Amino acid sequence: MSVPFDPASYDRQLEEKTVRLRELLAPFDAPEPQVFDSPREHYRLRAEFRLWREDQKRYYAMFAPGDNRTPILLEGLPIASERINALMPVLRERWEASPTLNHKLFQVDFLTTLAGDAMITLCYHRPLDAEWQAAAAQLAAELDVSLIGRSKGQKLVIGHDYVTEKLDVAGRTFSYRQPEGAFTQPNGTVNGKMLNWAFDALGERQDDLLELYCGNGNFTLPLATRVRKVLATEISKTSVNAALSNLDDNGVDNVTLVRLSAEELTEALNEVRPFRRLHGVDLKSYDFGSVFVDPPRAGMDPDTCELTRRFERILYISCNPETLAANIAQLHDTHRVERCALFDQFPYTHHMESGVLLVRR
């Protein structure tokens, strides 16, 4: 659910979210949350637009939730990054001037980074040929972007099919490949604040870390520098490949990444059944003191929640405070909330990202 874009009301909206998080965590005697705000505009590093034909021209369009018939035609998008806003009119001029680029184009996706990288995906209702590829290569060079063409069963890449982000955590710069189509945190500035909070909350440890839902290694890279070893899990092949590249690019060599779901890892640790994907991984060699979880909106399922109970410290990043509270309720008899934080990843919406550190009583 969104609220109107109104930078003048930002502080009030953030306070309302803070009150909501405070209320949800009150039954667990949580401390006052640290609050990490967002830039008021130009904070969103990715944007997806449908194209809407009107007066023989195509316009960038978005739709209100539940209404795919009434387009909102856009010249720019104030919540999107400055790079996206700079690219939008120039790209539109180029496709209007090129029948090859324009023909049956129906969607445009932008992905940018704080480091200045940019990628554009053009989606078509037709096969893409050599003529399109030549026009796209010229366009990519003019705009200084990577460009991807997509149609049914087809993906053509000009440049790279990823962007590179650079984020500073506790004085060290980490480089991240962010693949086209894979999940990335949309608000880069707030993501950097999340990484630094998690790094500080975990602390310097002499034991090992288990990470569930590691994605492209967003948290894995900095947290790995705080512990002896990391065992990280992820099920998306695209994210696993990106995480492996990111570990290599950053010289992080104390992480073992396995493609298992949280539920499968629970079975493996409980010795319910063996997994071929764990071949060569000696689970008994790990001395886990902490677990880091960043689950989907549904939160942790009950079995995974019980798995985390066996760890002294549970570091939890949540995109849904209601399921976070439900998971804490399940763990409250053995773990207390030592730290909590609100990260305003999604200004002008009711969505909030939050973090808690749970420590065994």
Curated annotation (Swiss-Prot):
GO terms for molecular function: rRNA binding; tRNA (uracil(54)-C5)-methyltransferase activity, S-adenosyl methionine-dependent; tRNA binding. The keyword Ribonucleoprotein does not apply. It catalyses: uridine(54) in tRNA + S-adenosyl-L-methionine = 5-methyluridine(54) in tRNA + S-adenosyl-L-homocysteine + H(+); uridine(341) in tmRNA + S-adenosyl-L-methionine = 5-methyluridine(341) in tmRNA + S-adenosyl-L-homocysteine + H(+). This is tRNA/tmRNA (uracil-C(5))-methyltransferase. It comes from the Bacteria. S-adenosyl-L-methionine binds at residues 185, 213, 218, 234, 294. It comes from Pseudomonas syringae pv. syringae (strain B728a). Its EC number is 2.1.1.-, 2.1.1.35. Belongs to the class I-like SAM-binding methyltransferase superfamily. RNA M5U methyltransferase family. TrmA subfamily. The active site is at 319 (nucleophile), 353 (proton acceptor). InterPro entries: MeTrfase_TrmA_AS, MeTrfase_TrmA_CS, SAM-dependent_MTases_sf, TrmA_MeTrfase, U5_MeTrfase_fam. The lineage of its organism: Bacteria, Pseudomonadati, Pseudomonadota, Gammaproteobacteria, Pseudomonadales. GO terms for biological process: tRNA methylation. Keywords: Methyltransferase, S-adenosyl-L-methionine, Transferase, tRNA processing. GO terms for cellular component: cytosol. The keyword Transferase applies. SUPFAM superfamilies: S-adenosyl-L-methionine-dependent methyltransferases. It holds the Pfam family tRNA_U5-meth_tr. Dual-specificity methyltransferase that catalyzes the formation of 5-methyluridine at position 54 (m5U54) in all tRNAs, and that of position 341 (m5U341) in tmRNA (transfer-mRNA).
